[in-house]
Amino acid sequence: MSVLTVPRQTPRQRLPVLPCHVGDPDLWFADTPAGLEVAKTLCVSCPIRRQCLAAALQRAEPWGVWGGEIFDQGSIVSHKRPRGRPRKDAVA
């Protein structure tokens, strides 16, 4: 049996705290538009936001908040409408 030793990290070597790694991970896949907006807001200060978005686009993520953007059916949308009846008026 071998033992894996992990060197201690100094404060400068520590990885940054990422918003998606603390709290409720389901927030980034919320069912409600309000929950998704909270996740987007938390992404604003993330140090790897651009890399996260680029990786999500490359992987063709189907849904969730990635890099501060909402993905719905594989496309980036500005906001997600709540479930319910569709609009009565046609969208131009």
Curated annotation (Swiss-Prot):
**What upregulates it?**
By sublethal doses of antibiotics such as erythromycin, streptomycin and tetracycline as well as the fatty acids palmitic and oleic acid (in clinical strain 1254). By the antibiotic erythromycin. Positively regulates its own expression (in strain H37Rv).
* Keyword terms: 4Fe-4S, Antibiotic resistance, Cytoplasm, Disulfide bond, DNA-binding, Iron, Iron-sulfur, Metal-binding, Transcription, Transcription regulation
Q: Does the keyword Nucleotide-binding apply?
A: no
Pfam families in alphabetical order: AT_hook, Whib
Q: Which residues bind DNA?
A: 80-91
* GO annotation terms (biological process): cell redox homeostasis; negative regulation of DNA-templated transcription; response to antibiotic; response to fatty acid
Free-text description of this protein's post-translational modifications in UniProt: The Fe-S cluster can be nitrosylated by nitric oxide (NO). Upon Fe-S cluster removal intramolecular disulfide bonds are formed.
- The protein's name is Probable transcriptional regulator WhiB7
Q: Which organism is it from?
A: Mycobacterium tuberculosis (strain ATCC 25618 / H37Rv)
